[in-house]
Amino acid sequence: MSETRFDLIVIGAGPGGYVAAIRAAQLGMSVACVEKRTTLGGTCLNVGCIPSKALLNASEHYADAAGGGLGELGIELGSVKLDLPKMMRGKDKIVDSLTTGIDFLFKKNKVTRLQGAARIDGAGKVTVTDGADAGSYEAERILIATGSHASSLPGIEIDEARIVSSTGAL
């Protein structure tokens, strides 16, 4: 990474962050976007809204086929089998397609992607750690778009075995 100074550094590449980064670049700003994941899109795209909806959609199709719901439409099926590993691969394919699309938009709009965890060290100063683009960066403006993460209830630990978060479920 040769460039270390930008008009704007966006911290977080979820739906708010990546859209803001792309729009700022379209308006003529030099923009970097820091994301701790190796893929863009944030929680929603990687382990939240999108993959859960993909699995829900597949599950609804299975339920219609297995439960005879298609019979009302004149469609009769023999035995119906659920292939969970294949369903998960389908979900992964959808997520990969969308994250690749955001990558393409970053390149098309000349948004610099910085992989790692961001820390604001002062006015206009951002340090990126724990990633491929670790280093010090400067910007006229910093936009924080870090999104959310799962929280547990007091006294109830998310162990991802018996009590799972949305991330663990996917």
Short names for language-model regions:
Residues E3-F6, I22-L170:
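Glycine-rich flavin
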Residues G17:
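N-terminal Rossmann-fold NAD(P) dinucleotide-binding loop
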Residues S2-G14:
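Beta1/beta-strand and adjacent pyrophosphate-binding region of the FAD-binding site
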